[in-house]
Design a protein with these regions (language model features):
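Aromatic-anchored segments of alpha-helical transmembrane domains
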Residues: 23-30, 99-108, 146-159
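Membrane-interface micro-motifs in multi-pass membrane enzymes
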Residues: 111-132, 162
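C-terminal transmembrane module of polytopic alpha-helical membrane proteins
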Residues: 1-9, 153-200
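Aromatic-enriched alpha-helical transmembrane segments of multi-pass intramembrane proteins
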Residues: 6-21, 50-54, 137-160, 191-198
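N-terminal TM1-TM2 helical hairpin plus the immediately adjacent luminal interfacial "cap"
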Residues: 11, 16-94, 109-115
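Alpha-helical transmembrane segments in multi-pass membrane proteins
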Residues: 76, 95-99, 103, 166, ...
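Membrane-helix interface "capping/anchor" motifs
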Residues: 84-92, 129-143
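Alpha-helical transmembrane segments and their membrane-interface exit regions
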Residues: 103, 124-132, 169-180
Length: 200
């Protein structure tokens, strides 16, 4: 990881657990307090009226009932640990929140819809690994995986599913982050290549 992240239960990043709890707590509490959904969900009309915070707060509640809540929280539980091991705590949080911000803006301005859930931010966090995969380890498996992710995101866009933009924006965020702040292994490899006789 680029930034040190405290681990618990072996190789499980504490920051990933905290992220899951921050999202899961209000989502589960929503079963006892249904009014939380109306209070935090994304509503383009209310957002245009000045309640801009709904773009971000909508990630902490779920609009898919029990099945949707379980699916979203399970997906986050699978995605967050490896993502935070890869990116570190600060960058992992940044990617999740930026993914939610972009998804919220798109579903407010481009694909106006009322809703809630962490699916967009989770997909962006997962897709960010595609951006780093090709740049750090440009081998066939990474290239194929990135191509599948990008094509999948583009396909969702063509059927007017805003989650496609979450996938594509996540991949772009990952590529931008690894380009601006490359991991040490990438720096070392580039330095080694520059010192080869063929490069001199």
């Amino acid at each position: 990881a680029w930034l040190k992240d405290r681990r618990i239960f072996g190789d499980l990043p504490l920051s990933a657990v905290v992220l899951w709890l921050v999202v899961a707590a209000p989502s589960i509490l929503q079963a006892l307090m249904p009014g939380l959904l109306d209070m935090f969900r994304r509503d383009p009309t209310l957002i245009r009226d000045g309640q801009w915070w709904r773009i971000l707060t909508s990630v902490f509640v779920q609009d898919g009932g029990l099945a949707g809540t379980v699916a979203n929280l399970l997906t986050l539980a699978v995605v967050a640990p490896p993502a935070f091991r890869l990116w570190g705590a600060a960058r992992g949080w940044a990617l999740f929140l930026l993914g939610q911000l972009l998804f919220g803006l798109l579903t407010t301005a481009v694909f106006p819809s009322t809703g809630a859930g962490n699916s967009g931010a989770t997909l962006a966090l997962a897709a960010a690994a595609a951006g780093i995969g090709v740049l750090v380890r440009p081998r066939m498996p990474e290239i194929v995986l990135t191509a599948v992710i990008v094509v999948g995101g583009a396909t969702l866009v063509t059927v007017d599913d805003a989650h496609g933009f979450a996938v594509l924006s996540g991949a772009l965020l990952g590529a931008a982050l690894v380009t601006l702040f490359p991991p040490h292994s990438m720096d070392a490899r580039r330095a080694g290549e520059s010192l080869r006789p063929s490069a001199l």
